[in-house]
């Protein structure tokens, strides 16, 4: 069975098409793997084995009939932020207890239309607010990686921690995820997987629980660059139900893998050399530069002068949008309801009981910066900074840069229930220091594993591209992957 779960999506696709394996065999292998491991890793909050078997059998029928889709028979995990008809969708929050949508998100519908099989819903930070997957109502996800000679439990990153852990532990062939400030790229870096946040508007947001609507974007987490390319092609589409989705053709991302980087310009931003950055992150960055140089790319220094303002601006804009989006959860129509003496009391008690501490903190921050006395001082200024950040990237790309290379995270994975981070939320927010600029500018960014630190934990590099030029990111990330090799955790679970 483990031989089947070790197949990449590309490998499984070939074996399914050649009828060397069946979709039901592949699906059963993943169901067994989840049964054996989920109690320890807590990657899934809802497993759907019966539904998976039904979908797999239908895939086998289509393969036999010669009408197989692009992802026919491939078992996937779905982040608990995507609406799935009749299946638990709670954004890992108590306030959405028992919610089973009557509609399907556009992203998941695209995957099912291409023949993919749903294994279940994946754990995440509550409402996607977090960088460690510790804010989930269902408890933390445990990273499949451990430091050499240590049994300490590590976080997988967040908010898409369940997606990253499940992919790294081979509990699904690939997974959907979302990224508002780094929630695909940071967990990918922490788990030795590949994660891409596409350009804002590349994937529909319809049917995805909203955190910050101008920043949220769906994307895949996968075992390697090729699998990420295959998944994004299926996930992406224009959608009449989402006016922010863009009507552009979705390229065949897989087709660019292996193309030459000769003559490409890779920008290295000075501002990403932050105080206190570990030497091994700097070394990895230099190694990435050397790999791209060896592949024929030209390396140029660039300046993104407003980078230092990105994190504070992000933590004004994102909570402000969250404060508005989360106002709809009141206990009236769906989810948790705590009775009160009147409707206002019921609202207050429901929201007090239903939201976790981090979500409440961000709602309070958002409500504060939107209040009459502070709107101009905070929110409007943050939006102006956002425009300047976007302009920095535009100037770099206008000067001929094709992609930008940076570290993905300021460190490797840290321990579950880290007291330093628990005591100071700002330290936790600093995990997003290399990733939030990409969301603020609406650009695509990919995290690709590039090495291990001195403790034997994975580290990633990030590539940032021009709007709707994910092809260049895949092509360049593939070169890094070929040079670095792939990384798999030693099995303990």
From Swiss-Prot:
It is an enzyme of class 6 (ligase). It holds the Pfam family Amidase. It comes from the Bacteria. One of its GO terms (molecular function) is ATP binding. Gene3D superfamilies: Amidase signature (AS) domain. The keyword ATP-binding applies. Heterotrimer of A, B and C subunits. HAMAP family: GatA (MF_00120). This is Glutamyl-tRNA(Gln) amidotransferase subunit A.
């Amino acid at each position: 069975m483990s031989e089947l779960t070790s197949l990449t999506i590309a490998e499984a696709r070939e074996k399914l098409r050649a009828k060397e394996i069946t979709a039901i065999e592949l699906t059963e292998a993943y169901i067994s793997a989840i049964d054996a491991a989920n109690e320890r890793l807590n990657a899934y909050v809802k497993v759907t084995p019966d539904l998976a078997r039904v979908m797999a059998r239908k895939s086998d029928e289509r393969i036999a009939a010669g009408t197989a889709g692009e992802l026919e028979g491939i078992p996937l995990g779905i982040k608990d932020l995507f609406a799935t008809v009749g299946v638990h969708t709670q954004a890992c929050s108590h306030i959405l207890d028992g919610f089973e949508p009557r509609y399907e998100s556009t992203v998941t519908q695209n995957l099912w239309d291409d023949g993919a099989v749903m294994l279940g819903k994946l754990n995440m930070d509550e409402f996607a607010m977090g960088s460690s997957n510790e804010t989930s109502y269902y408890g933390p996800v445990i990273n499949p990686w451990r430091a050499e000679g240590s049994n300490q439990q590590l976080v997988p990153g967040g908010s898409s921690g369940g997606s990253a852990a499940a992919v790294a532990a081979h509990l699904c062939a690939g997974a959907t995820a979302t990224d508002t400030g780094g929630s695909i790229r940071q967990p990918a870096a922490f788990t030795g997987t590949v994660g891409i946040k596409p350009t804002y508007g590349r994937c529909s947001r319809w049917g995805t629980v909203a955190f910050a609507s101008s920043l949220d974007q769906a994307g895949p987490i996968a075992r390697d660059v090729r699998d990420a390319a295959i998944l994004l092609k299926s996930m992406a589409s224009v959608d009449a139900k989402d006016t922010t989705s863009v009507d552009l053709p979705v390229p065949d991302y897989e087709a660019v893998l292996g193309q030459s980087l000769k003559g490409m310009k890779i920008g290295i931003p000075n501002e990403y050399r932050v105080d206190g950055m570990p030497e091994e992150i700097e070394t990895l960055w230099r190694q990435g530069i050397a790999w791209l140089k060896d592949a024929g790319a030209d390396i140029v220094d660039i300046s993104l002068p407003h980078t230092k303002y990105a994190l504070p601006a992000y933590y004004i804009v994102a909570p402000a949008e969250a404060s508005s989006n989360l106002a709809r959860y009141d206990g009236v129509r769906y989810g948790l309801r705590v009775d009160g003496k009147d409707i206002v009391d019921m609202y207050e008690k429901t929201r007090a009981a239903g939201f976790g501490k981090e979500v409440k903190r961000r709602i309070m921050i958002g409500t504060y910066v939107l209040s009459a006395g502070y709107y101009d001082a905070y929110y409007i200024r943050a939006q102006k900074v956002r425009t300047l950040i976007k302009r920095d990237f535009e100037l770099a790309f206008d000067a001929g840069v094709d992609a930008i290379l940076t570290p993905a995270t300021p460190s490797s994975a840290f321990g579950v229930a880290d007291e330093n981070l628990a005591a100071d939320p700002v330290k936790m927010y600093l995990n997003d220091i290399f990733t939030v600029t990409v969301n603020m500018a609406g650009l695509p960014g990919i995290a690709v594993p590039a090495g291990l630190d001195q403790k034997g934990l994975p580290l990633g590099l990030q590539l940032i591209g021009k709007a709707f030029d994910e092809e260049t990111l895949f092509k360049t990330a593939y070169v890094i992957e070929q040079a670095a090799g792939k990384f798999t955790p030693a099995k303990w679970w």
